[in-house]
Amino acid sequence: MKALMKDFSLSAVVAGFIATVISYAGPLVIIFQAAKVANLPHDVLSSWVWTISIGSGVLGILLSVRYRVPIIIAWSAPGSALLVTMLPDITLNEAVGAYIVSSVVVLLVGLSGAFDRIINRLPAAIAAGMLAGILFRFGTGLFVSVKEQPWLVLAMFGTYLLFKRALPRYAVLAVLVVGVTITIASGELRSDALVIGLATPVWIAPEFSWQVILNIAFPLVMVALTGQFVPGMAVLRNDGYETPASPLISSSALGSLLLAPFGCHGLNLAAITAAICTGRESHENPSKRYVAGVSGGVFYLVLGIFGATLVSIFSAFPAALIAALAGLALLAAIGGALSAAMAVPSDREAALITFLVTASGMSFLGLSAAFWGLIFGIAAHLLLGLRKPIPAVASPPAVGRKEQPAR
């Protein structure tokens, strides 16, 4: 504690606060969308918010202090996006069973130290194609929502473009402020839905179904490892932190496993928001930036305790605002995934197949588009990567050589 107080700085605290606010401004919206399409009860949604907030806060504080590195733990936004399409077709108990299975798999990967080996075997373009396909509907949803409330959505879109040009780090936060301001000014806010209350965890007994495990657990594992831990570790490495990956993965997976029966779909390393805390904006001295990780964890805890209030706040806003905010918050992720999917010429076609299958929303044999996207993509990668046999070329006839008469 003495070392923490000695290294304390206002800039690091502000960095942690901004990282937390941006986490709630964007990815949390997707969870509300998933809960809405699945018609989850208010107390279950409140418990879901409580688990991901408390889990992120506790792990962020402990890991930041332990390794003296600004570590931000967050819930998986792509994983939440996957649940938007899957939750309406399964029971909540089956979903929790899939959460447990995915957490166990990620935990085993972390404990075994096999993270690097697994990532090296899975083509990055295939993983990126699946991620882009999962997120695709949120990008299109942004523009579909223009029909419902054109002035609100277009104002948010314009704000996003302006801030992306001038202050890209605060673009999503600015979009949220503009959207909320317009909603309140136009009288669209449902003030009767606002309540003040503390969140309480709700136990959900798990049920296990092989179809649900393949549909949800397998894609969640892939998304966590390739879409969260890989870029999360890249952010740390980029700013000079050589923290080992295995304990970070194992700790996140263990936290996810313990909180899964209360609705937690998965905790992992943050990437975009983590960059706010690992850079110079947090502190000039890299060894003191871990305070930003602790700060972010504390803010997560505070907001998690008042999860019921957060749920009611988001429920009071129009659906168009939520859809537009989710789409804008994920634009960079969609663009990055598409760029990575098309980056390697030899894998481009396989990645495109993965993207198209996943984005199609198809279902076959009870298995989801995300699962089939990986299967079709990997199959295409293997088949297209086979070396074509070199056809035998006949030797050209000798020129100017006379035939020898037969004897």
Q: Which residue ranges define each predicted feature?
A:
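Alpha-helical membrane-protein architecture signal
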Residues: 10-13, 155, 214-215, 250-254, ...
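Buried hydrophobic packing segments
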Residues: 82-83, 159, 235, 277, ...
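Helix-loop-helix hairpins and the membrane-proximal interhelical loops
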Residues: 1-46, 173-245, 393-407
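Cytosolic juxtamembrane regulatory segments of multi-pass membrane proteins
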Residues: 141, 253-261, 402-407
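Helix-loop-helix junctions within the multi-pass membrane cores of secondary transporters/permeases
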Residues: 2-6, 12-31, 50-131, 243-331
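Residue-level signal for transmembrane alpha-helical positions in Major Facilitator Superfamily
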Residues: 25-26, 151, 227, 269, ...
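Structural signal for hydrophobic packing residues in well-ordered secondary-structure cores
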Residues: 21, 25, 38, 62, ...
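Membrane-embedded alpha-helical modules
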Residues: 88-194, 295-394
